[in-house]
Amino acid sequence: MKCFLVSRIDMPGALDCASRMKTALERAGHTVVLDPDTASMLGGSGHSINKVSADMAVVIGGDGTILRTVQQLHEQIPIIGINHGEVGFLADLEPEEAGAFVRSLAPGFDVEERMRLSLWNEEDHLGDALNEGLIVTTRPAKMLRFSILVDGRLTEQFRSDGILVSTPTGSTAYAMSAGGPIVDPRIEGFLLVPLAPYLLSSRPHLISSSRRLEIRLESSKPAKLVIDGQNTVELGSAVSLVIQKAASPARFIDVHRNFFEKVDRKLRKL
């Protein structure tokens, strides 16, 4: 199989792991290609993430490295993450488990699909998110006013420092820190979490992905949208965002770890 290898490059331990993985995969008969940054550190030529064609990707780093890879892939190929970050909710393997994974790797591996969000401003596609889209003011310490519409009906209005719209996968990221629930990733829905709302009655909502979700920014203050902590879009003021289920989900190699046991283990590290 052809394996695409991406590594965090600002951490020597991650690069050491990447070098070992490259050797192990090649010894097992797989072809390994590197992204340009990893290739610049390990030697050899690199292949752009948004142009690569491969059977799978091995991503070594934390959640940020995995999110960045998913963002840049033109076609969503199956990913396995090896944790070299802080917590690594998206990484199913620890470094000491990488060798056993390579030995068991064979064509026909199981794949788990994770829903992504697609964010639109009228006809403009702003981007897709595996974890979340965050709307915040560009002016510190200023609140924004939001209207939430579900299937065209106004369901809530509130003022807050911002709002998160998260996937179930992203429920263990920023949304959890902001007081949102942990959501089973097999559920397909939009998790809305107000950030520091002015009224205590403004609570998180989990909305089916089959519904049309619209977030209207009613404030005159300019705001910005941050997608998966990677890309920032300046929204201006008085704009409307429509959130849909993205056409292509993220794909992860399924190593058959129980989601709730994994979350419990990761949370104990915090």
Swiss-Prot record:
Q: Name one GO molecular function term.
A: ATP binding
**UniProt catalytic activity:** NAD(+) + ATP = ADP + NADP(+) + H(+)
Q: Which GO cellular component terms are attached?
A: cytoplasm
The answer on whether this UniProt entry bears the keyword Cytoplasm reads yes
Annotated GO biological process: NAD metabolic process; NADP biosynthetic process
* Compartment(s): Cytoplasm
Query: Top EC class per UniProt?
Result: transferase
The disulfides recorded in the entry are none
E.C. no = 2.7.1.23
Q: Which cofactor does it need?
A: a divalent metal cation
Q: Print the keywords alphabetically.
A: ATP-binding, Cytoplasm, Kinase, NAD, NADP, Nucleotide-binding, Transferase
Query: What is the protein's known function?
Result: Involved in the regulation of the intracellular balance of NAD and NADP, and is a key enzyme in the biosynthesis of NADP. Catalyzes specifically the phosphorylation on 2'-hydroxyl of the adenosine moiety of NAD to yield NADP.
In the record, the note on similarity to other proteins reads: Belongs to the NAD kinase family.
Put simply, this protein is called: NAD kinase
Q: Which organism is it from?
A: Methanoregula boonei (strain DSM 21154 / JCM 14090 / 6A8)
